[in-house]
């Protein structure tokens, strides 16, 4: 205890962080990890597991021949933005019909309606404008929209098995974590034959930690993830993100709609533009944050886990769920600025998305994930009663089963001729 206090006093005097993440000198493969230099001096550790038994090409070709025309979904919706910030989403196709969207897991329900009217939803609440219901329908139709976006495309969503050589799973962690939080998922899916990729964000795990705040902005981190994605991506890629990592999955799905086949968002929150809070404990000086680090770790344990027993403390420690220097933590929180990632940005996504929410999560309220389910086009929301923010550590078997069922899910083929006739 005295040693810990002394270390913090020395830190306040010298500004040097004990046990901080140091630079990685190699950019080669080591102990099953890749160290990739995405920019000069910016090296990320990546866990890349290749299947021990590559998929049978003949079996894949036979599967493709049998199911080549299946899983075709017509994604059609009109997104209207009004000048008072209100948003109206009309699903014009039959994409969200329950007979088309179904999973092997009977508990999964498709989220969405044929017409949704939504007010501006920001991190500060709904104060931006009046409610849509307060305006008479006749007057509402006469309003001149600020912007109208038409989404009209076809996607082929297929079953993704571990034996398929064109499938890669990407796992992206959030603030304070590392790729170690995915240990159970990486082991489970690699044993099923999937190729898996999990990076450490810069400043986290064994990646380098630049001592400049600009290195931790959303845009800098997003470009890192773009480099990782372009390095390992194949024909069908599935992105799995947790917390802040969900934002990077959303970014990649928007940037590469033809390469991102499915997305899983675990406790990612609502479809809101990112903006750092002005009144936050993370705006305090780094030395003060360092002195408060034991309190922050305890607060994370309380808010991130449904229980706070010995097992959870061990998971927190061994999973590196919250193990980052005070400088990196402060820079990460203040760098979360992404105005483009608003409701419209999310509404434009046509990729199938699974939302996973831990019922006891104190960081992300349930209504935020429900809001996300309303905005997205093809989505399922699954609530895990026993889990919290770190649900992949608390309930690994449940999460693994849920993810696997979603990977295997394939929608029934739509009758596009009948649908187009109905729309006319």
UniProtKB/Swiss-Prot annotation:
Q: Which GO terms describe its biological process?
A: lipid homeostasis; phosphatidic acid biosynthetic process
Location of the active site? 243 (charge relay system), 361 (charge relay system), 389 (charge relay system)
Region named Disordered? 120-143
The reply to whether Cell inner membrane figures as a keyword in the UniProt entry is no
Pfam families given for it? Abhydrolase_1 (PF00561)
A Gene Ontology molecular function term for this protein is: carboxylic ester hydrolase activity
Query: Hydrolase as a keyword?
Result: yes
This entry carries the following GO cellular component terms, namely: mitochondrion
- EC number(s) reported in the record: 3.-.-.-
Q: Which InterPro entries match?
A: AB_hydrolase_1 (IPR000073), AB_hydrolase_fold (IPR029058), Epox_hydrolase-like (IPR000639)
Keywords of the record, alphabetical order, are: Hydrolase
| The AB hydrolase-1 domain, residue ranges | 168-270
Family matches, as SUPFAM superfamilies? alpha/beta-Hydrolases (SSF53474)
Regarding protein family, the annotation reads: Belongs to the AB hydrolase superfamily.
Write down what this protein is called: Protein ABHD8
**Organism annotation:** Xenopus laevis
Query: Could you tell me the gene encoding this protein?
Result: abhd8
């Amino acid at each position: 205890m005295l040693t810990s206090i002394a270390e913090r006093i020395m830190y306040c005097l010298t500004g040097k962080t004990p046990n901080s993440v140091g630079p990685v000198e190699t950019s080669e493969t080591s102990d099953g990890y890749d160290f990739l230099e995405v920019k000069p001096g910016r090296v990320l550790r990546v866990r890349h597991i290749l299947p021990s038994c590559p998929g049978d090409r003949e079996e894949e070709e036979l599967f493709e021949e049998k199911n080549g025309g299946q899983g075709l979904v017509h994604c059609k919706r009109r997104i209207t933005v009004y000048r008072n910030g209100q948003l109206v989403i009309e699903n014009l196709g039959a994409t969200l019909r329950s007979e088309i969207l179904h999973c092997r897991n009977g508990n999964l329900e498709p989220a969405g309606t044929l017409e949704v009217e939504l007010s501006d939803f920001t991190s500060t609440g709904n104060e931006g404008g009046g409610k849509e219901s307060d305006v008479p329908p006749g007057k509402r139709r006469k309003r001149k929209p600020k912007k109208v976006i038409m989404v009209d495309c076809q996607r082929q969503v297929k079953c993704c098995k571990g034996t398929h050589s064109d499938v890669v799973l990407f796992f992206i962690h959030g603030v304070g974590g590392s790729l170690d939080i995915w240990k159970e998922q990486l082991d489970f899916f690699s044993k099923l034959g999937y190729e898996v990729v999990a990076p450490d964000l810069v400043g986290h795990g064994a990646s380098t930690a630049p001592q400049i705040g600009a290195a931790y902005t959303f845009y800098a981190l997003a470009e890192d993830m773009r480099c990782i994605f372009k390095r390992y991506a194949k024909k069908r890629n599935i992105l799995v993100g947790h917390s802040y990592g969900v934002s990077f999955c959303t970014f990649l799905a928007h940037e590469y709609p033809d390469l991102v086949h499915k997305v899983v968002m675990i406790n990612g929150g609502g479809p809101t533009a990112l903006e750092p809070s002005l009144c936050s404990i993370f705006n305090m000086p780094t030395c003060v944050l360092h002195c408060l680090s034991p309190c922050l770790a305890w607060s994370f344990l309380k808010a991130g886990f449904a229980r706070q027993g010995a097992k959870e403390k061990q998971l927190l420690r061994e999973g590196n769920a919250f193990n980052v220097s005070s400088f990196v933590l402060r820079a990460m929180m203040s760098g979360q600025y992404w105005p483009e990632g608003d409701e419209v940005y999310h509404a434009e996504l046509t990729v199938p998305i699974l939302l996973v929410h831990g019922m006891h999560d104190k960081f992300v309220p349930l209504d935020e994930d429900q809001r996300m389910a309303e905005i997205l086009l093809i989505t399922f929301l699954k609530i895990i009663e026993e889990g919290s923010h770190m649900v992949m550590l608390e309930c690994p078997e449940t999460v693994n089963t849920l993810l696997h069922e979603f990977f295997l899910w394939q929608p029934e083929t739509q009758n596009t001729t009948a649908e187009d006739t109905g729309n006319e």
